[in-house]
Amino acid sequence: MTYQISATKLQTYHRCPYAYFLRYEHKLTTPEFFGSAALGNALHQALAQCHRDWHYRFPLPTMQWIYQCWQEHSDGLSKSQVVEGTKILEQYYQKFIASEVSIHQPLAVEGKIQGYLQVENLEFVISGRYDRIDFLEDGGLELIDYKSSREVRLPDASEIDIQIGLYYLALEQTYRQSLQYLSLLFLRTGEKIRFKATGEHRKQVQTMIGDLAVRLRHDRGWEPTPGKQCDRCTFARYCPSVTANPAPVPEARSKPQLQLALNFA
């Protein structure tokens, strides 16, 4: 059984190895709160169909094509959500489709991507999701991540760097092409924010996974890293860096998953 790693897991490890250990190795559960994702999911699905199923014999799809895609994926939404989604897609069309001479067929739309990394005799499977992957005219790839949140909230720079590095590794292995940009496209505001990707992002992630592998291999070194993240950490009650008399850590639910492999590749 290989060891699964994702941007979310590696970002947790980067913030605090102890929090990573409690959540992913010790399997402590955390309370999670989710708002209604129905509108966001419907928008993602409509845009996926728009870019995946357009026949590309003509330079640009029409607005009618956008309406058709939206109609097929807006069942179950409230009337106000349908109206709101229509306005969001009309704005998207005007800004990212109608303003172009032509659009090109994406390399991939709405899927999963995997990569592999071997270090410290452990095999890591890198996994992630994407909304769209485009070929760039000057070479390389752009990964586009749709955001349907009401506010434009950018992750910390370090978290973006980790996400870029993991996608860089996975895309390079899958398509033999380098990631040039990770783009966050905020659907409600029509803003598209691009982050340049380089080989340094890949190296940073390789080093971080190597450090994680050493801790996993020897099952030690999970010291807390105090910081601003402590205020919202759900494991604060168990942490000696935050709580004077921390609660005992509950018994582990399952053993860590480790897989022997070859040397770092």
What are these model-predicted stretches?
Residues 1-2, 18-30, 67-73, 143, ...:
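Short amphipathic alpha-helical segments and their helix-coil junctions
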Residues 4-5, 138, 170-265:
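Metal-dependent nuclease catalytic regions and adjoining charged, substrate-binding loops involved
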